[in-house]
Amino acid sequence: MPELFEEITSNVKLLYSSTPIPAYEKYIGSYLCSGEKNAIIDPGPKTAIPGLVRVIKEVGLQPEQIDYVILTHIHIDHAGGTGTALNLLKNAQVVVHQRGVKHLIDPAALTKGSIDTLGELVSKYGEIEPVQADRIVTGEDGTTIDLGILKLQIVLTPGHAAHHLSVFEPAQGVLFSGDTAGIFHNGLLRLTTPPPFRLRETLESLDKITALNPKIICYGHLGGYGDAKNRINEFRKLLLRWYDYAQTRAKQGQSFTGVVDEFINKEPELNVYFATLDKDARKRDYSQLTNSVTGLMTANA
């Protein structure tokens, strides 16, 4: 039987919803924070919701015991299933950046933007269903989600997206970074810099989460790891190095995919990593890398 969840701390679990898309089974997941109340961070796309509910039950909770669904941002792979989830998590409120509120209520523009960026993958993620306005709570800097023994702090972290926020649990030093500090998947740190990418805002957000002095970082893709501040710093160095190279090649007229191929060939760890991938995983990661490189090449500092 496949692993359904992983304990990060005694109060935090990574839930594998097993999104039924080849190579995405453990690329997308959610975090469960439990005290007297319970919160899910990033429910994932619509096709992940049946698996998410199954794992919630597996850890000993009922769907009605989820009090909050917190969205680090509204991109379809993190939040596309929110409306679907709320039909099952009947007592939950949604916490989201103020810029994301209107897109939860009316997801038409979000759906179009997702199709424009991701193409056929959107149909595999599933329809983005609307969320009722009275179930939405706006997350601001300083907003605290009180779960009893756990107090989750909202920290606005634009850069990856204008509507991005992170979540910090100070008692254990756990940071839920969404896509602010990159992807750490299959042992490799990678960029998450889709267009329209904002370098200055991203660097400011990295400073902001570093100042929290986190001990554990929980990536949106995927898992919880110690030595959080060093990991954030490693992402900063990777980001600046790739940004400078991508900007230079953009001015020289190189194509997006041309720069992607250059990165794969010139970065030893990336080259070895891509050589190990099967067809589906390579398609997933090549697409993600192309999206990130496009953001770097078209960014304004």
Name every feature range the model reports, one short phrase each.
Residues 104-155, 203-210:
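Metallo-beta-lactamase
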Residues 41-44, 67-73, 95-97, 157-159, ...:
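Active-site neighborhood of phospho(di)ester-bond hydrolases with catalytic His/Asp-centered motifs
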Residues 165-220, 230, 297:
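Metal-dependent phosphodiesterase/nuclease catalytic metal-binding core
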